Design a protein with these regions (language model features):
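Alpha-helical hydrophobic helix detector
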Residues: 18-34
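A short, glycine- and basic residue-enriched loop/turn
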Residues: 9-11, 24, 65
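Short coil/loop residues immediately preceding or within conserved phosphate-binding loops
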Residues: 9, 21, 117
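N-terminal leader/signal peptides at the extreme start of proteins
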Residues: 1-12
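Extracellular/periplasmic head regions of type IV pilus-like filament subunits
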Residues: 63-131
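Conserved hydrophobic/amphipathic alpha-helical signal-anchor segments
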Residues: 37-78
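Short, surface-exposed interaction loops/tails
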Residues: 114-186
Length: 186
């Protein structure tokens, strides 16, 4: 007499295990791209938040001293997929701004020749595709539609209307710069 006839078998068949593995694979194929996009959105928020903080610091400095302060590209290395220490190479310490910890983006403020208008921008290649993502804030001269009396600020990634190779022509808002500078929305 066979002693296994009265006992029921416990466990999963190979087919059942293969179905579970296939379902997990499908879920991973859906979840991983969404997770990567979520990470890129989180990295992007650093640039937007810090541009807004620079704007606040510039306005506070202007209300006290009547002039805006230029900020050299800081950190001097290009923004990338990895965080780097923020090193102020000029200007940001004067207005009292420094980001917390390390940063993905590099930041710059260019002022008009009469120091009554400025453009702040942030740039980084956070997705590693070789093209920088750029965010900016354009503060025009009082009552004006261009930055500065003559409408020039020199070379900067994100520029306003009336400036050669204009990109972001909306004033007083933190917005993505010209789309040719990389994907700004994920």
């Amino acid at each position: 007499m066979n002693k296994f006839l009265g006992k029921s078998r416990k466990g999963f068949t190979l087919i059942e295990l293969m179905i579970v593995v296939a379902i997990i694979g499908i879920l991973a194929a859906i979840a991983i791209p969404n997770f990567i996009r979520f990470q890129l959105k989180a990295k992007t928020s650093e640039g937007k938040v810090n541009i807004a903080a620079i704007r606040t610091a510039e306005e506070a400095y202007f209300s006290e001293f009547g002039t805006y302060v230029a900020g050299s590209v800081s950190p001097a290395t290009n923004g990338s997929t990895a965080k780097v220490p923020f090193v102020d190479v000029g200007g940001f310490g004067t207005i009292g701004w420094s980001p917390e910890g390390q940063v993905y983006f590099n930041y710059e403020v260019v002022i008009s020749t009469n120091a009554v208008a400025y453009v702040a921008d942030a740039g980084a290649d956070i997705d590693g595709n070789g093209t920088d993502q750029a965010w900016g804030y354009v503060h025009p001269a009082p009552g004006g539609t261009t930055v500065g009396e003559d409408g020039t600020l020199g070379a900067i990634v994100c520029v306003g209307a009336g400036i050669p190779s204009g990109g972001n022509d909306v004033f007083n808002q933190v917005l993505p710069c010209d789309p040719s500078y990389g994907q700004s929305e994920f």
